[in-house]
Each structure stands twice: as structure tokens, then as C-alpha cells.
A protein has these predicted regions:
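An N-terminally biased module of ancient metal coordination in phosphate/nucleic-acid-related enzymes
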Residues: 1-92, 97, 103
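Active-site-proximal loop/helix segment associated with metal-binding centers of metalloenzymes
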Residues: 108
Length: 108
């Protein structure tokens, strides 16, 4: 399916990354009310398993399951496709985690 550029937002942060506000469903409800978006992608700052580089802007590793659940529950609400993603800083020592867990096991 093709969308116009203004029908898609793939860089959205909720309260999970500490500098966003509101729950995922809140963003979907606002998008529906405004009637502009067809696709809304969440890209919370990816947690690191050992909490390195945690400056208060990442979700906690323990929140990954809740984050995934909230995105999946919101998908399709109001006719909006909701996508699960993560904003990752490239850290060479974490390449295996990004590849195996976020991309592989969790399917980001």
C-alpha cells in the first residue's frame, strides 16, 4: 500500500522513553481525531540490557514486553496501522543484542 508523506509518522515517543508524554493509545486517539494519519510508528529509545548509557531517555529493559503489548493492542484502532519500532544508538558491543533480540526474537 502507498501512502502520502503526510499520512505516515514513524518517529513517535510515548512515556516509555521518559521525554514523551502519554500512553500509546493516547497518540492513536489523537491521530484518529485529527484524521490525518494512516500509519503511526513508535520508536522508543531502545533499552540496553546492562543499563549502560541510560540517561533517563530510554525505556527500561524490563518494560519491553509492556511496550510491545501496548503497541499491538493499539494496532488498527480507529483504522490506523500502528507499528512497533526502536530508536537505537549504534554501539558495537551491543550489535548482538540488536540483531538477536530486537530484530530476531522480538521482530522489530
Amino acid at each position: 500500500m502507498r501512502y502520502r508523506y503526510n499520512e505516515v509518522n514513524l518517529h513517535t515517543h510515548s512515556y516509555y522513553c521518559r521525554h514523551g508524554k502519554g500512553e500509546i493509545v493516547d497518540y492513536v486517539n489523537v491521530a484518529k481525531a485529527k484524521g490525518l494519519l494512516k500509519v503511526l510508528g513508535f520508536s522508543e529509545h531502545a533499552p540496553l540490557p546492562d543499563r549502560t548509557l541510560d540517561y533517563g531517555t530510554r525505556m527500561a529493559y524490563s518494560e519491553l514486553d509492556d511496550y510491545e503489548r501496548d503497541v499491538k493492542r493499539a494496532d488498527g484502532r480507529g483504522g490506523i496501522k500502528v507499528l512497533l519500532g526502536a530508536e537505537c544508538d549504534w554501539i558495537e558491543d551491543e550489535a548482538g543484542y540488536y540483531r538477536d533480540e530486537l530484530l530476531g526474537e522480538r521482530g522489530y
